[in-house]
Amino acid sequence: MVTRTEIDTGIAKEIQQHLEFGAMTRFLHWVRAFMIVFLVASGFYIAYPFLQPDASGEPVIFLQAYNRAFHCIAGFVLIAASIFRVYLFFFAPSSKPERTSFWQLLNPLVWAKTIGAYLFIAKHPHIKGAYNPLQFTTYFVLGLVTLIICLTGVNLYANVYHDGLGGIMGACFSWIDSVCGGLANVRAIHHIATWVFIVFVPVHIYLVIWNSVRYPNGGADAMVSGIRYSEEQRV
């Protein structure tokens, strides 16, 4: 029995490279990732100082103060990186694949096929852009959580440091106290948002690896190289 191959029919497959994430987008991704990990660790220490320095009669060991200071610095780095990341999403030419992903949110068929692919009952649909609808929605919600944790964090900062930048922040964001019903609620919301990140990070890492294994077209390393691969037929 003779079968017709791709060579017989004159069809060949080519691997095409597409720039999916620009250099600055990738850089900001890793900046925010490292800041989030550090903020979670240092935040837990601020809430419950589980390490104590050696006892000293002189006020020269300020472990909690240093930890809080670096926590605040990392928080402002996260705020700056997040603002710049939003700017890149809307205006950077290299972020066009991300903006294109938005329109698939309106397609229920793509939604159904995407969920089916994660449940192993359907093939992953061909998507236009960087994200499928489930990914886009997840990252959008994560952006809202980032906004919440930054606003509550700035409010907590202003209630500790009353001069300089803290005074400016207090004048600009004192309304958060009233909206949340007091500083205790602001702190509670800040902690709840932290737990959202704690849950998200391992799930995100797992799904990135899962997608890379099941669909080896540059999933995991796309945030390193920025390149996504696709097969195209050439007659």
For each predicted feature, which ranges?
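Membrane-embedded alpha-helical bundles that constitute the cytochrome b-like, heme-associated redox core
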Residues: 1-235
